[in-house]
Amino acid sequence: GTNDFPRARAFYDAVMAALGCKVILEYPGAVAYGKLYPEFWVQAPIDGRPASVGNGSHVGFFADSKAQVDAFHAAALAAGARD
């Protein structure tokens, strides 16, 4: 989850395009990205409590090439991520 949905939305709008993904579904406080179907969601917590670190969580994305990984990384840095 995220505690700042508008900021998270702007970040993922910028970086998911580097993997060829687009917005597939969106709801108030939630958005799903993918190529043909939802592959990745980001949303504000539905229980109204603050988002927290998910112990043991893992997030991965499909990429077609190292060049696409590099483009995703560059887009993430440009959108405010840190190395």
For the regions a protein language model found, what residue spans apply to each?
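Core segments of cupin and vicinal oxygen chelate
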Residues: 1-40
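Vicinal oxygen chelate
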Residues: 3-6, 61-83
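Long, continuous compositionally biased terminal/linker segments
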Residues: 34-71
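Amphipathic alpha-helical interaction segments
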Residues: 19-20, 48-49, 80
